[in-house]
């Protein structure tokens, strides 16, 4: 039954989860957190909202370098998700749509199935990737009513640990065309921590706060060299510079950008950091990872290289259907910069069109909802009976 299916986009940073008959997923931090202010308690998932002081928050992550390695942490988070404090339903006797990383290790896939079938007693599993679900949702959203079997598109998933470029030709992933860049939201937050700690004050233990700063003030420069000219003009520097008021967890629970000329009460007593080129040099790493010593190409070059591994007759449609998902796709200026750089790398007679949905974080989950409610969903589910008869190997035949 479609209304019994759980859809879980199990990301390294957040898990997007809900029933297929619900309109919106719950977005839950996929980690356990500990705070200095409450040493006796661990916060799981959205319980962090109950923490009075999130300074120096310590994270215990289920994912390491993009892969699910800490199963104790993951099971703790899943237990919370499926409790009354989460989505309020058990996995027992339900089908589940669950995502995994591209090119996932076999041992991790085996452990995932084992826990789902033996610990949570699910009826069946549909295992896929976030890129596949995004492609499925893209078809569902298509005004031309393209079918999955005729879809030619490129999915750029700017995730927490990695950025993946995944081409689809006639609805199937072109495995030899998949490209991975070891740069994502986590690396950007770490770089911003380094810059603020070096130039202003030590925030190396403040991942939670710095991640909020990144989300609030960072943007992608359309022309990086021109943007760096801010240092040659005081007027340009003032245009880019913002003062960010740091939280003190007493009067200010979450940091914010100070509005010049409109100070809030007691604002002058609050601790602030002044940010200028940090605002655009941090997201620049998505386009030039070598800036911090990661010897890999940026996203535009990865897309151009992925194109070379695809049939030439599909190139035109692939470039017309480039879909960008993931949290870091939300930086202002990301799309114009990517289009500009990619335009210079592909033939002039081919048009480039980029699409970023309104909600790139939840987009794959909505694709999972479409999959779970499709008429032939049951045909692709790996059931408890299949698992008992064939074990892990049988799912690869689906």
Curated annotation (Swiss-Prot):
It comes from the Eukaryota. SUPFAM superfamilies: Actin-like ATPase domain. Gene3D superfamilies: 3.30.420.40, Actin, Chain A, domain 2 (2.30.36.70), Actin, Chain A, domain 4 (3.90.640.10). GO terms for biological process: heterochromatin organization; transcription initiation-coupled chromatin remodeling. Keywords: Cytoplasm, Cytoskeleton, Nucleus. InterPro entries: Actin, ATPase_NBD. The keyword Cytoplasm applies. One of its GO terms (cellular component) is nucleus. GO terms for molecular function: chromatin binding; nucleosome binding. It is found in: Nucleus, Nucleoplasm; Cytoplasm, Cytoskeleton. The keyword Cell membrane does not apply. Belongs to the actin family. ARP6 subfamily. This is Actin-related protein 6. It comes from Drosophila melanogaster.
